[in-house]
């Protein structure tokens, strides 16, 4: 049977504008140690791997706002986190104003 992965899609307002800028950097130069794939102009796909949640060395490269989203996806047994401009705002997660 093929593997079918769960995706959590949430609003990109759950990360700061600064963090979004880091996600937009070319993978080879990205300061965040994650598998990140752009979703055109609307957001990002992020692989939620066990090592991200469990390894404190990897977590030090991940901004806390993004780590909160990753932990939320992990708690809901998702393999992928999709941060999308039109995604749902989750009351348990902090939101940020990108217009500052």
Where are these regions (language model features)?
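Short, extreme N-terminal segment that most often corresponds to the first beta-strand
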Residues: 1-23, 82-83, 97-100
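A short, structural micro-pattern
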Residues: 4, 40, 75-77
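An N-terminal amphipathic alpha-helical segment
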Residues: 15-50
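Short, surface-exposed beta-strand/loop "edge" segments at domain boundaries and coil↔beta transitions
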Residues: 16-18, 53-56, 88-93
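Acidic, aromatic-enriched beta-alpha/helix-loop junctions
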Residues: 33-34, 41-43, 52-74
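Short, compact, well-ordered microdomains
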Residues: 60-100
């Amino acid at each position: 049977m093929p593997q079918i992965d769960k995706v959590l899609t949430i609003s990109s307002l759950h990360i700061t504008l600064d963090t979004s800028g880091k996600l937009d950097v070319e993978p080879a130069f990205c300061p965040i140690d994650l598998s990140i794939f752009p979703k055109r102009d609307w957001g990002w796909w992020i692989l939620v791997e066990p090592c991200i949640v469990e390894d404190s060395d990897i977590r030090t490269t991940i901004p806390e706002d993004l780590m909160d989203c990753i932990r939320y996806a992990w708690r809901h047994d998702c393999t992928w986190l999709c941060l999308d401009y039109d995604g749902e705002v989750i009351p348990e997660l902090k939101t940020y104003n990108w217009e500052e």
